[in-house]
């Protein structure tokens, strides 16, 4: 398999950025296929720290970086991120970055609607980043979205704005909010258009040509499988499909071209925002995981909820996502724990389950059944071979591998790019 698809196997924040960066030096093209600028990732390259939200990780290495049609693009956020990364010495030009001409745009009305819904008093918040991702996807499915290509045609742009505001202004009136001016929105989009259009391209063809010429493509997922709109902990999910199948639909390549699917999973669990979390810890162990793992969101700065590794739910996401191998990250965060617990089943209303139930109410009742493993005193930080790991750490990794029923392809032992133990090369598998 010449290509590799990287997806999160938990609730996001698994360390995909580092692994994508680690793999990208061997890739020719890096492509994003879903989400927006709501999920951030941090790359540590030498002494430089890059924080990206929308741009594919390959940009920091000068790789051709593609934003696929499955991504919703905030044009103002894109320009701001390009400017910020450029100030760190990264060269970003239309030759390096391509945006799908059919990608949906996130507009100011989407951000405002997102915030209005999260702030309402009569409903349960989802815990969104309030960046307009969900409302933009709603308009895409509703066939009224403004897309990148519309910026190139003033007449078409006015028609699209009229159509989308017919819907949104009705919503705004119902929420007690003033209507948005069509002239204002057209003016805002017309102003930003020259900064976006040079990057617009038929990315399906760009990727087809790359694959045809035997270039290696790295498909970069955002968030995680447990936030997938179909397969996640609904309704506490994102608004797109995050599993590997979306790599095809979200870029325009065929399913056979997504290649080796690498699922990223932390050696423990974290979650940002609302929703069920069976193994969540509210004690000193949970606090220690958060402090050691620096568990704060890149985009929002929100503190992440922490818990023990959940083998049940991770096994489920790996199967749904067609994952070939797992990258286990942040093993070093578990250094020093005398006992480490792993969830091996759930109990719901007295019944033992080997999967997460589909219903929101049943998920909230799921109580973890734990298996206790011995911790280790030595350090795993910076380890690059099995010989560098304490014996109990090796046993932990092997037990996780058995429980999730999927090979551990590599282990990450620090934020540093090269601190990786490789067992199975995704590009050669």
Swiss-Prot record:
Binds 1 Mg(2+) ion per subunit. PROSITE patterns: ADENYLOSUCCIN_SYN_1, ADENYLOSUCCIN_SYN_2. Its EC number is 6.3.4.4. SUPFAM superfamilies: P-loop containing nucleoside triphosphate hydrolases (SSF52540). CDD domains: AdSS. Transmembrane segments: none annotated. IMP binds at residues 13-16, 38-41, 129, 143, 223, 238, 302. One of its GO terms (biological process) is 'de novo' AMP biosynthetic process. Pfam families: Adenylsucc_synt. Substrate binds at residues 298-304. The keyword Glycoprotein does not apply. Mg(2+) binds at residues 13, 40. Homodimer. Plays an important role in the de novo pathway of purine nucleotide biosynthesis. Catalyzes the first committed step in the biosynthesis of AMP from IMP. This is Adenylosuccinate synthetase. It comes from Maricaulis maris (strain MCS10) (Caulobacter maris). The gene is purA.
């Amino acid at each position: 398999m010449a290509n590799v698809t990287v997806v999160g196997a938990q609730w996001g924040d698994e360390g995909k950025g580092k692994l994508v960066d680690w793999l990208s030096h061997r890739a020719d093209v890096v492509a994003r296929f879903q989400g927006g600028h709501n999920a951030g990732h941090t790359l540590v390259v030498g002494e430089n720290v890059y924080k990206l939200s929308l741009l594919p990780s390959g940009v920091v290495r000068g790789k051709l970086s593609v934003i696929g049609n499955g991504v919703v693009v905030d044009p103002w956020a894109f320009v701001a991120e390009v400017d910020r990364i450029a100030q760190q010495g990264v060269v970003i030009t239309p030759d390096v970055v391509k945006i799908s001409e059919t990608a949906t745009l996130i507009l100011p009305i989407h951000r405002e609607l997102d915030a209005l819904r999260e702030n309402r008093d009569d409903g349960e918040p989802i815990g969104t980043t309030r960046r307009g991702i969900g409302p933009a996807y709603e308009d895409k499915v509703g066939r009224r979205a403004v897309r990148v290509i519309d910026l190139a045609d003033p007449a078409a742009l006015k028609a699209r704005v009229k159509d989308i505001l017919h819907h949104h202004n009705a919503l705004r009136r119902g929420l007690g909010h003033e209507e948005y001016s069509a002239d204002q929105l057209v003016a805002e989009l017309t102003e930003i258009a020259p900064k976006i259009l040079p990057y617009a391209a038929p990315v399906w063809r760009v990727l087809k040509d790359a694959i045809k010429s035997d270039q290696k493509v790295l498909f970069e997922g955002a968030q995680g499988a447990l936030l997938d709109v179909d397969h996640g902990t609904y309704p506490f999910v994102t608004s797109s499909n995050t599993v590997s199948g979306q790599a095809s639909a979200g870029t325009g390549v065929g399913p056979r071209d997504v290649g080796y699917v690498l699922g990223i999973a932390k050696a423990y669990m974290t979650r940002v925002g609302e929703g069920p979390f069976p193994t969540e810890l509210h004690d000193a162990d949970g606090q220690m995981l958060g402090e050691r793992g620096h568990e704060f969101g890149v985009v929002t700065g929100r503190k992440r909820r922490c818990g023990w590794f959940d083998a049940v739910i991770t096994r489920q996401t790996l199967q749904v996502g067609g994952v070939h191998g797992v990258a286990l990250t942040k093993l070093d965060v578990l250094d020093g724990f005398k006992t480490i617990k792993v969830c091996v089943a759930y109990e719901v209303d007295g019944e033992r389950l080997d999967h997460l139930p589909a219903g929101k109410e049943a998920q909230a009742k799921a109580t973890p059944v734990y298996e206790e493993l011995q911790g280790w005193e030595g350090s795993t930080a910076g380890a690059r071979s099995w010989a560098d790991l304490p014996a109990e750490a090796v046993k932990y990794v092997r037990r996780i591998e058995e429980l999730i029923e999927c090979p551990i392809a590599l282990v990450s032992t620090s934020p540093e790019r090269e601190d990786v133990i490789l067992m199975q090369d995704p590009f050669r598998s």
